[in-house]
Amino acid sequence: MANELPTNVSYGTVTGRYLLAYADSSDVGLNPDGIAAGGEILFTPLVERLRDATSTPPVTIIPKQVACTINVDGYLCGPDGLSSVRLLATDDADLDVVGWLWQVTYLLTDVEGSLIRGIPTHTMSLPGGTTVDLITIAPVAGLVG
């Protein structure tokens, strides 16, 4: 049985959508087709433990890696299946470490299930009570050529 974390712990929400651009198929339109990527995105906390001395009773929180999938429409889905994921906030003043980061690793696949490159691993902060769209914070790809 899962226990709730203390009520003074803050969270943020992460969203994102990932489509692969393929040549136009035999559909009605003439434009390239957008097909949902597959695979997963991993969120790894870059902190070993967080002490919440202000909760009753005090508690040590050990953040764990969170694996999210990409649904059939290309949206990031948390372990609960919803089109977003709630993670521990990195700026919670009730915890003894403020300003830690999440590492974001993209393991996206194409329609054949092969890993695709394109979005490098990066870090992110997640302020409490906010929604962060990964599309707006992922590193911009350089030109190839």
Predicted features and spans:
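Extracellular beta-sheet/turn segments enriched in Thr/Pro/Gly and aliphatic residues
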Residues: A2-E4, M124-G145
